[in-house]
Amino acid sequence: MKKSILAFAISAIFLTACKKEEVTPTPTGSGPVSIYFEHLFGSSTFNLGQNYITGNNDTMNFSLFNYFVSNFELVKADGGVYTYPVDSSYFLVKESIDSSRTITLKNVPAGEYVGVRLIIGVDSLRNTMPLTSRTGILDPSTGAAGMYWSWNTGYIFLKSEGTCSSSPSMMGMSKMFQHHVGLYGGLNSPTINNVKKINLTFPGTYKAIVGNALAPEIHTKVDISKMYNNVDFSKYSMVMVHPYSATLANNYATMFEVEHVHND
């Protein structure tokens, strides 16, 4: 009996020692980080051509919804920050193109990340660079076609179009709305600055673990209904270079929230 008890005790000590030695390996190398933008209107999946009811009891139907995201920074678990190379950090998200709602940051250094910072729009420096420095998705004639004001020399940060039940009919078009939000503070004369930097902290204990062949995806909810909280379409159905664009920009800066993180 005593021998059995002794053998059991030795086995328990051995197993405990083994468990203590099981340490999660430190991530090494580098890898991709993907960010998926899930478009919603309140609790409903967002789709072009579908009716949605706002908090003001307006019925909205969208024909277009596009926006730029840029200038990404990843916040490390130890408080450090990795700044993604700026020249590669511009992306155009279009509701009409499913693949555009997933963006990938390449060659991110290994580590554990607990948050992401980004700009909704295009920063003032890039807005004022020579066209030769604005290629790819920022080329006004190709990648950024329809998202650039040639007459105002600046990018449209977010473009939303469609119909709304409380919009007035004008120019032969019934109940139409067009919200084109841009303006970066101005070059030769001051303007409104609608460049919005947002800080998204991962909920709970979620971390994006980069390295060791892992490719995390940050699942981000984008609730478009928040952009239209308390918007009076009878007054502001057409907003472009207008002071009210600041209200729309402040609203859409609240649309984004990280729901969870996959580490695959």
Show where each model-derived region lies:
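Positively charged n-region of N-terminal signal peptides that target proteins for export
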Residues: 1-4, 19-20
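Sec-dependent signal peptide hydrophobic core
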Residues: 5-10
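C-terminal motif of bacterial Sec signal peptides marking the signal peptidase cleavage site
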Residues: 14-17
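A short, solvent-exposed, low-complexity linear motif enriched for acidic/polar residues
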Residues: 19-264
